[in-house]
């Protein structure tokens, strides 16, 4: 079996180490309404279409109960739409600052292309958001062959449609000749639902939720413990493989190709 294409996520996988761009904005739009949410809560639905992310936050029991305590009712679809509009406005202003390729990504992409492998991508950002991110990332040397957003298909993650559209546009089939790599639980589900080899990357991921500085300064034993928690979470949600950095991706590909592994 030969791997013919790799489909990458964006924030937390190829750009925006730690996936910090949306995090503070999610927390801010709830805080403005007197409902405090933690970074851990804000990260949990990461990878979903952003309005679905806001909706998922309002459905968390603790957050819903706090909202009910303050407003005397549960969040409505109108509340969700209003918060999402605020989220978009704030995020658009800061996105250019969070589009730098993560260390090592450009080198891995170049190596894959030398092997004739096509590069696709999926995201939880809208097309309008990605117009900003993709343009800035391209200026800094990262440009996949194809990009699909949830706006381009009937539904975003965990549905497989973005991966299928990549496959069609890149001209690659069957799906087990492709790898999906991402940094969230929804990425793992997307890849598995699409019938692809699915890989979770840990350092720089939203699931780990640490900045480069925090990783560098953390006690090695504590960091190792956090890495293993994320690794287990990826595996529990369908990852065939986990890697700590993007530089390990090609060794995963070689395992798939040389051992003639079968997707299960």
From Swiss-Prot:
It is an enzyme of class 3 (hydrolase). The keyword Metal-binding applies. Keywords: Hydrolase, Magnesium, Metal-binding, Schiff base. Binds 1 Mg(2+) ion per subunit. CDD domains: HAD_PHN (cd02586). The active site is at residues 9, 50. Involved in phosphonate degradation. Homodimer. This is Phosphonoacetaldehyde hydrolase.
């Amino acid at each position: 079996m030969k791997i013919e294409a790799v489909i990458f996520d964006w924030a937390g996988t190829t750009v925006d180490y730690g996936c910090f761009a949306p995090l503070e904005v999610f927390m801010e739009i709830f805080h403005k309404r007197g409902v405090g949410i933690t970074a851990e809560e804000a990260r949990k639905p990461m990878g979903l279409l952003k309005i679905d992310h806001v909706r998922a936050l309002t459905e968390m029991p603790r957050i819903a109960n706090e909202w009910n305590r303050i407003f005397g009712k549960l969040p409505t679809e109108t509340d969700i739409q209003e918060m999402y509009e605020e989220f978009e406005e704030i995020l658009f202003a800061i996105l250019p600052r969070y589009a730098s390729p993560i260390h090592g990504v450009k080198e891995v992409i170049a190596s894959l292309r030398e092997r004739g492998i096509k590069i696709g991508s999926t995201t939880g950002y809208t097309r309008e958001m990605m117009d900003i991110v993709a343009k800035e990332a391209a200026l800094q040397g990262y440009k996949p062959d194809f990009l699909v957003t949830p706006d381009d298909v009937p539904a975003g993650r965990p549905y497989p449609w973005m991966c299928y559209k990549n496959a069609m546009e890149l001209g690659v089939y069957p799906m087990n000749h492709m790898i999906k790599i991402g940094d969230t639980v929804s990425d793992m589900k997307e890849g598995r639902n699409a019938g692809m080899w699915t890989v979770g990357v840990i350092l720089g991921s939203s699931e780990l939720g640490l900045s480069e500085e925090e990783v560098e300064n953390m006690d090695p034993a504590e960091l190792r413990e956090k890495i293993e928690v994320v690794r287990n979470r990826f595996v529990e949600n369908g990852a065939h493989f986990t890697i700590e950095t993007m530089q390990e991706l090609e060794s995963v590909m070689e395992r798939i190709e040389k051992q003639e592994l079968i997707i299960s």
